[in-house]
Amino acid sequence: MSFWKNLFTSAFTPISAEADELIKEDRKQFEENTPSKKNFETQSPDEPSPKTTDSTGARDANLSLKTQEPIVSADDAKGAQGKGADEKEEKKETIQPPEEVKTEPPQPEEKEGKEAKEPEEPPKEEAEEPQEGGEEEEEEEEEEEITDPLEKMTQECMDAPDCKEVKHHFEECTARVTKKVEQGDKSEDCIEEFFHLYHCARDCADPKVFKVLV
């Protein structure tokens, strides 16, 4: 047991001594680099300030940058964004493409020539109108020439010997009624005598007209 104890102590004693020396050196270096509160109070203004580590320098630089940056509130940021959007819209409104000027192509001279020729057409229409009027006059003359054969033969039969007696009674009635009308008496008329004469003339004219048509 004592053998193993002596062996363990002889092996690890130098290592522990070296470790203690390293720890002491690191602590001494740390104390030299980090200034204490006592040093700041007792330090004279002529003495140089103790050295600071890189971490403390970086921290001081960040603090100085934060103090220099302006503090912008949320409302100010929104207002700045709104102003930027308004300025962009105004630029879009002001920058507009130039309006295209529509120019009508000049009309060809052929159309003018056609327009100049158009007034010459009405005389042709005027010349055609007299022809149409002449045709209508010819048709009217033909219609006037064509007479109803029944009326013609009925008139002839009234003067025929077969209807001579009936016609005589009609003429006497007509003369008598005319005198009464002149005196203001309208009590008599000759309608019955007229129909007797007309029927007599038709009885005479109808067979003759039938023969002509057949």
Swiss-Prot record:
InterPro entries assigned to the protein according to its UniProt record, in alphabetical order: Cyt_b-c1_6, Ubol_cytC_Rdtase_hinge_dom, Ubol_cytC_Rdtase_hinge_dom_sf
Highest taxon listed in the record's lineage: Eukaryota
Pfam families cross-referenced by the UniProt entry: UCR_hinge (PF02320)
Subcellular localization(s) per the UniProt record: Mitochondrion inner membrane
Compositional bias of kind Polar residues: 41-56
Feature: compositional bias, Acidic residues: 126-148
Keywords per UniProt: Disulfide bond, Electron transport, Membrane, Mitochondrion, Mitochondrion inner membrane, Respiratory chain, Transport
GO-annotated cellular components: mitochondrial inner membrane; mitochondrion; respiratory chain complex III
Disulfide bonds: 157-204, 173-190
Record's bilayer topology term: Peripheral membrane protein
Region described as Disordered: 25-157
GO biological process, one term: proton transmembrane transport
Predominant subcellular localization, coarse grouping: mitochondrion
Compositionally biased region (Basic and acidic residues): 25-40, 84-125
Function of the protein: Component of the ubiquinol-cytochrome c oxidoreductase, a multisubunit transmembrane complex that is part of the mitochondrial electron transport chain which drives oxidative phosphorylation.
Family: Belongs to the UQCRH/QCR6 family.
Assembly description: Component of the ubiquinol-cytochrome c oxidoreductase (cytochrome b-c1 complex, complex III, CIII), a multisubunit enzyme composed of 3 respiratory subunits cytochrome b, cytochrome c1 and Rieske protein, 2 core protein subunits, and additional low-molecular weight protein subunits. The complex exists as an obligatory dimer and forms supercomplexes (SCs) in the inner mitochondrial membrane with cytochrome c oxidase (complex IV, CIV).
The protein, known as: Cytochrome b-c1 complex subunit 6
Source organism (scientific name): Schizosaccharomyces pombe (strain 972 / ATCC 24843)
Gene transcribed to yield this protein: qcr6
